[in-house]
A protein has these predicted regions:
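Acidic, metal-coordinating helix/loop segments flanking the phosphotransfer/catalytic sites
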Residues: 33-51
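Acidic catalytic/metal-coordinating carboxylates
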Residues: 36-39, 61-65
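Active-site residues of response regulator receiver
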Residues: 9, 55
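Receiver (REC) domain active-site loop signature in two-component systems and cognate sites
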Residues: 58
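Short amphipathic alpha-helix used as the core "switch/output" element in two-component signaling
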Residues: 42, 64-73
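Non-catalytic signal-transmission and effector/linker regions of two-component phosphorelay proteins
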Residues: 1-4
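Two-component/phosphorelay signaling modules centered on CheY-like receiver
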Residues: 12-32
Length: 73
């Protein structure tokens, strides 16, 4: 079984670091990378991932806002 994953962080190095660590797991597929909360919501709606690594402190639409928006869906 493949674990479809989305990485969300406004820091490119954080995304790269997560990506490098997750490559060690054959059953993890990174389906998208997002730089902000609004991109994340669109991506989650499109890809319907099993797992989302979500940065909480992002400018503008932060991680808490993403969680709130998804809870309202």
């Amino acid at each position: 079984m493949t674990i479809r994953t989305i990485l969300v962080d406004d820091e490119p190095l954080a995304i790269k670091g997560l990506e490098m660590r997750l490559q060690a797991f054959e059953d993890v597929e990174i389906v998208d990378r997002c730089a902000n909360g609004r991109e994340a919501i669109k991506s989650i709606k499109t890809h319907k991932p099993d797992l989302v690594f979500l940065d909480i402190q992002m400018p503008g639409f932060d991680g808490f806002s993403v969680i709130g928006a998804l809870a309202d869906m």
